[in-house]
Amino acid sequence: MKQTIGGFTDSAQGGLQGLPERSYGTALYRAAQADSRIVCLSADLARATETFLMRERMPERFFSLGIQEANMIGVASGMARCGDITFAHSFCVFVTRRVYDQVAMQVAYPRTNVKIVGFIPGLTTQLGVSHQAIDDIALMRSLPNMTVVEPCGPEQVPAAVQAVIAHEGPVYLRLSLASQAAEAARPLMTLDIGRGQVMVEGTDVAILATGMMVGQALEARALIAQHGLSATVVNIHTLKPLDIQLLERLARSHRAVLTAENHSTIGGLGAAVAEYLALHSLPVRFAMVGVRDTFAEGGNTPYLMKKYGLDAQHIAAVSRALCQAN
């Protein structure tokens, strides 16, 4: 027996046809089925943040605050103080830059158990500068008490949801839409907050990537292998706290370290790694791949990735240059 819910077809077995199995929306709904403390807040973007399933099936635990992101953060903090695990959703730019004072004063400072979930990070939107979050990691990473998480793809989203639920305190979860990331062939991955994941070991250059850039880094590894170079690729799914033990090991065992992020090179993953390398006098060649000190333009993601030097070919070129430097 099948039933239509919110325009999607729901099978009797409980799987949604139209919303991928590994989507955030599916993971949040299933987590809410298991934990009555979970509530879902939306700033008029239930479809665009994959939370329509909560709206349709658990309306008593879904709250639409309209296009009032600052108010949503305040409500989320208040509900968390009453014992809820509050998930607040919008696009990345709107739950970070637009509401930064509310996030700082009502979530980070009092350490309320609010999970701020942002979608369409960096260059993953065609809506141009107003919607391109290239500074959100920098903003959230600088807040005391804030944990920052970005899974590498659909295969890690379910684990990311479980990890942020288990983590007591504020979290910023940075996600791409399920429609922007093809259902991955790789098996489901775990996610331990604060511990990076080595995807594949190499010897010459360590490529530390986050989010969608992990896939680009793996492609770059294959490209530089054609030139006799071996790369370690690491999934840095937790941008704060950074896995400094892993970083130190990689810096001491490789000729070079390279970071790759769908974000500005100012204040993001690259800056965090550079800070640690410099402060601890680790003598390793280092470079960053990301959006340089510029606003991007509108366009599809492959075009923007190539234009701003975030694609696998550019990562490979920078890796080769690092390893060949005197």
Give a label for each model feature.
Residues M1-R174, S179, T190, ...:
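Thiamine diphosphate
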